[in-house]
């Protein structure tokens, strides 16, 4: 079902409302490829060595070994008051959740692991202040999802990491 929704909904977006119900409109695809056999077999082969976990991300530290690498791609913080969408699940990923993620990054750092995090470049200094002891890099990224088509395109986002 996930593959069908991913291939047929607007820009492959997955999102639910506060009741936990899927709420993405249909995409405008004439002949979407729902299932490509070669890709499925290749993915299956790669996933043979992968353990997929369900639960709170903070529990992943229990599976880290040696110098593990963590990549975090949370719901991005809104760029301004009018771009307030950041809820892909029924639980909001607000500033408190962003700070909780930063605390977990500190835990990852303290355990001797590496991390990289991507997020929006809000221009209000929120992430610059929150992650001041880490490396913060601004990079150009293309965005294709926005309610206002004129606001789609390139903008800067942040890459935050604990290594050079």
What spans do the regions from the language model cover?
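SAM-dependent nucleic-acid methyltransferase catalytic core
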Residues: 1-71, 75-85, 100, 111
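A residue-level signal for conserved active-site and pocket-lining positions in enzyme catalytic cores
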Residues: 3, 115, 160
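Conserved phosphate-coordination/catalytic loops
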Residues: 34, 51, 92-99, 151-154
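A generic structural signal for short, non-catalytic loop/turn and secondary-structure boundary residues
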Residues: 45, 129-132, 153
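Short glycine-/acidic-enriched loop or helix-start segments at secondary-structure transitions
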Residues: 81-82, 126-127, 148
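Short glycine-enriched, charge-decorated loop/helix-capping segments at active-site entrances
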Residues: 85-92
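Conserved Class I SAM-dependent methyltransferase catalytic core
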Residues: 97-142
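Class I S-adenosyl-L-methionine
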Residues: 134-164
């Amino acid at each position: 079902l996930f593959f069908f929704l991913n291939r047929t909904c607007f820009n492959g977006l997955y999102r639910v409302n506060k009741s936990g119900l899927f709420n993405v409109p249909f995409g405008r695809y004439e002949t979407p490829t729902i299932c490509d056999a070669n890709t499925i077999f290749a993915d299956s082969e790669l996933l043979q060595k992968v353990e997929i976990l369900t639960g709170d991300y903070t529990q992943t530290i229990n599976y880290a070994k040696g110098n593990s690498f963590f990549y975090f791609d949370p719901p991005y913080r809104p760029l301004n008051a009018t771009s307030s969408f950041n809820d892909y699940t029924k639980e909001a990923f607000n500033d408190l959740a962003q700070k909780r993620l930063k605390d977990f990054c500190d835990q990852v750092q303290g355990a001797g692991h590496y991390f990289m995090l991507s997020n929006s470049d809000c221009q209000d200094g929120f992430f610059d202040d929150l992650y001041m002891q880490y490396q913060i890099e601004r990079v150009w990224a293309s965005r294709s999802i926005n309610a206002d088509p004129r606001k789609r395109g390139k903008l800067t986002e942040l890459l935050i990491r604990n290594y050079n």
